[in-house]
């Protein structure tokens, strides 16, 4: 019945100073536009959005400049309200992008609760998330009340949420907080996976947290970075990466980089380790090590820019001019089209190793053939010596020449095979880049 009533109303209802307050509470999410009557573009955009979303939200509009001023809105402006909060924006010309952003802000609780059902939504919100860790519902309610003025002040800039420290306390470690020391507060810049933990000895009060949040927004606080020491040497087939050299090794270099993000306790990671070392050996030659780096990072001890969704993912970071964005590969996931393409990218990278392995086997066979040929020639030369010194000299010279040609041919095959392997892998990666 409620939906039928909404359908009976116009897509955009006209509001006045007498009806505005009641209209604001008429639905879960209400958008009111304050546009001048002659602002044709803004009015048309608002009406178009309203026609498409009238089943989900309530839309109202007024051309009354005095009412806009009384509401503290500068024309052209939009105000989005819900039972828990109000969000507003003023701009020279609100665009279609304005509306989803306002609806998302207005529909997010002022201080919500982080849990399995809400975590993904907070991560996708596009703004930082402030965590309030506390053990009991009573404590979480108390801190929510204490920090409510800050949540109101920074609505649309930072999401505030409590989190059950008993059930999800281990997540504090991901934010570089000390697990077990409660209550605790930290901000996560979700888009960059940067962490800003507070001093856990300080009290969680509006004053203390307010200053921390203001400094965070002003860029006065550096993110907390957890890192192992940079290795003194990295001579093995697999380069060890830590947080403090991640940018230099993985991002700012002139090579393609394949990175394994692992956890020492992960059984799958342990099973992969010897194979990954073999892969590193395949790329250890002078020819290929100039093009590709095989690397690994302990994701439990090092912060990295990308959030790791479980362990054992590998990420290929191609040279920027070939593919400017990193691609995360999760081998144990199946079914989605993006993952399928990512697996193809992994295969394109792995084809280098396979081709090099083929080239190596070919080289061994060619070298063996060359050795046999040389031995046979020397044997024939020896027999010839027995029959005549002059003929022996010519035969030995001819044998040495043939052996040299055979070895050169084998070396040429190795070089061509490796070059072809690198060329095919580069072309394959380029093809996948075009699809992505």
From Swiss-Prot:
UniProt site positions, description: Contributes to redox potential value: 267-268
Chain residue ranges for the region called Disordered: 328-436
Active site: 266, 269
UniProt keyword terms in alphabetical order: Allergen, Disulfide bond, Endoplasmic reticulum, Isomerase, Redox-active center
Record domain Thioredoxin: where: 216-365
Basic residues bias locations: 334-343
Entry-linked SUPFAM superfamilies: Thioredoxin-like (SSF52833)
E.C. code: 5.3.4.1
GO CC annotation: endoplasmic reticulum lumen
Keyword hit for S-adenosyl-L-methionine: no
Catalysed reactions, as listed in the record: Catalyzes the rearrangement of -S-S- bonds in proteins
Stated role: Participates in the folding of proteins containing disulfide bonds, may be involved in glycosylation, prolyl hydroxylation and triglyceride transfer.
Name of the molecule in the record: Protein disulfide-isomerase
Species this chain originates from: Alternaria alternata
Lineage summary: Eukaryota, Fungi, Dikarya, Ascomycota, Pezizomycotina
């Amino acid at each position: 019945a409620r939906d039928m009533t909404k359908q009976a109303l116009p897509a955009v209802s006209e509001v006045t100073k007498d009806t505005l307050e009641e209209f604001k509470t008429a639905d879960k999410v209400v958008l009111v536009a304050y546009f001048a009557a002659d602002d044709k573009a803004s009015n048309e955009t608002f009406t178009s959005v309203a026609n498409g979303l009238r089943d989900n939200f309530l839309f109202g509009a007024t051309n009354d400049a005095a009412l806009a001023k009384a509401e503290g809105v500068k024309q052209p402006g939009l105000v989005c309200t819900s039972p828990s909060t109000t969000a507003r924006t003023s701009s020279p010309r609100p665009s279609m992008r304005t509306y989803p952003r306002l609806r998302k802000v207005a529909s997010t609780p002022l201080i919500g609760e982080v849990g399995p059902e809400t975590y993904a939504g907070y991560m996708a919100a596009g703004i930082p998330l402030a965590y309030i860790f506390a053990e009991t519902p009573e404590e979480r309610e108390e801190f929510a009340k204490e920090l409510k003025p800050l949540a109101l002040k920074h609505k649309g800039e930072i999401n505030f949420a409590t989190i059950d420290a008993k059930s999800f306390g281990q997540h504090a470690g991901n934010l570089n907080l000390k697990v077990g020391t409660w209550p605790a507060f930290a901000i996560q810049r979700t888009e960059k996976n940067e962490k800003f933990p507070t001093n856990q000895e300080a009290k969680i009060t509006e004053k203390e947290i307010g200053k921390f949040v203001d400094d965070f927004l002003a860029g006065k606080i550096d993110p907390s970075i957890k890192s192992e020491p940079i290795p003194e040497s990295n001579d093995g087939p697999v380069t060890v990466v830590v947080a403090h050299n991640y940018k230099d090794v993985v991002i700012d270099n002139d090579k393609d980089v394949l990175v394994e993000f692992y956890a020492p306790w992960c059984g799958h990671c342990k099973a992969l380790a010897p194979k990954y070392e073999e892969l590193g050996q395949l790329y250890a030659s002078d020819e290929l090590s100039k093009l590709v780096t095989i690397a690994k990072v302990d994701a439990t001890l090092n912060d990295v820019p990308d959030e790791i969704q479980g362990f054992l993912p590998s990420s290929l970071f191609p040279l920027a001019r070939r593919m400017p964005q990193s691609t995360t590969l999760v081998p144990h996931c199946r079914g989605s089209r993006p993952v399928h393409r990512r697996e193809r990218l992994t295969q394109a990278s792995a084809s280098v190793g396979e081709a090099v392995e083929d080239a190596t086997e070919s080289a061994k066979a060619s070298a063996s053939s060359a050795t046999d040929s040389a031995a046979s020639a020397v044997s024939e030369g020896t027999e010839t010596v027995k029959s005549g010194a002059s003929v022996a000299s010519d035969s030995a010279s001819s044998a040495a020449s043939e052996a040299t040609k055979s070895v050169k041919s084998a070396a040429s095959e190795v070089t061509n095979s490796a070059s072809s392997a690198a060329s095919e892998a580069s072309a394959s990666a380029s093809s996948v880049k075009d699809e992505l």
